[in-house]
Curated annotation (Swiss-Prot):
This is Vitellogenin-B1. Precursor of the major egg-yolk proteins that are sources of nutrients during early development of oviparous organisms. The keyword Phosphoprotein applies. It holds the Pfam family Vitellogenin_N. Residues 24-71 form the Vitellogenin domain. The keyword Phosphoprotein applies. Produced by the liver, secreted into the blood and then sequestered by receptor mediated endocytosis into growing oocytes, where it is generally cleaved, giving rise to the respective yolk components. Keywords: Phosphoprotein, Signal, Storage protein. Induction: By steroids (estrogen). GO terms for molecular function: lipid transporter activity; nutrient reservoir activity. GO terms for biological process: cellular response to estrogen stimulus; response to estradiol. Disulfide bonds: none annotated. It comes from Xenopus laevis.
């Protein structure tokens, strides 16, 4: 009986659909700001490290039905 219940629970969990395709409105632009740091070198005391800081602004807007433009 426990095996049947376990099999039903696994079948129920496996049958759930997930929507992986994002949905964006065609009339509204979406703006994202990203910031990151890239460091080079050995992380020990007394040793030099160098790095660069990155800033990025990404805008996603509707272009056509199910087509989007990334700026």
């Amino acid at each position: 009986m426990r095996g049947i219940i376990l099999a039903q629970l696994l079948a129920l969990a496996g049958s759930e659909k997930s929507q992986y395709e994002p949905f964006f409105s065609e009339s509204k632009p979406y703006v994202y700001n990203y910031e990151g740091i890239i460091l080079n070198g050995i992380p020990e005391n007394g040793l030099a490290r160098s790095g660069i800081k990155l800033n990025c602004k990404a805008e996603i807007s509707g272009y056509a039905q199910r087509s989007y433009m990334l700026k």
